[in-house]
Amino acid sequence: MRPFTYERATSAEDALERHNGGAVYLGGGTNLVDLMRLGVEEPGRLVDVAHLPYGEVELRPDGSLVIGAAVSNSDLAADPTVREGHQVLAQAVLMGASGQIRNLATVGGNLLQRTRCSYFQDTAKPCNKRNPGSGCPAREGEHHNLAILGHSPACVATHPSDMAVALAALNASIRIRGRAGERTIPIEDLHRLPGDEPQRDTTLEDGDLITAVEVPALGMPSRYRKVRERASFAFALVSIAAALDVRDGLVHDVRLALGGVAHKPWRAWRAEEALRGAEATEEAFQRAAEAELEAAEPLRDNGYKVPLARNLIVRTLAELAGTGES
């Protein structure tokens, strides 16, 4: 591990001032410190922002939430306002990592965690995300757990966060403090597809600090489902965050986002469009899933993710509609 200095920020303004010359923000450190040990990340300075006053979950009168970026994953999942009004978010958080890691990991850090692609984590191997221009050996190598949607010749990595998938389905917004002041962006605009710059995971600018996540009221049943290679402490092969409002047998509103299939949480806009106003039947859910997955471009060894994602969409929607087994 490269030598580094450690500083604790006392405010957002102080954090911005300290973020220069190779500095990196430190929250819980559950991903960053691992990457430092591997030599993937080599910051010269860590600026600790975990103790800034962003550690609360606020329930607004309209049922929306403001979640501070320093809230731990454990506290978020246990918060009664989250468990009652945004079940999909609590479920997603509890399906990520282990209890010990959730105790340390923060909301802001969870959103910014980096891919678990084995080539990215091995500094002896080329990787366009870690070393731009060096190539993407995963395309012809080990990629059974990598992307089937939105990837590019430069990168087939997937985003690892369960929480981010749920927040995408919830139409969350990200509150950011930057050098030009504060701004709020849709979570859809936070993470990037790889394109020809896979080293850029997000649209954040130098020094930008996530301070909170705003989550609108939901008002319909929701669920998070995750398929993984073992029962716990494993990243998704495919996951889904779903919410469904059925009235008089018709889909009034629906939210769908997929994890484990793309470089970012994949909002299933095509499937949502196909479902609104349709009958809430498994046949309609099947057609919507197929419409979404028409864009899939599986590689040699991850084609199984297409039927897996399709079946997960259909099963989860059927559960929410009361037409399938839970």
PLM regions: where:
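C-terminal structural segment of proteins
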Residues: 1-326
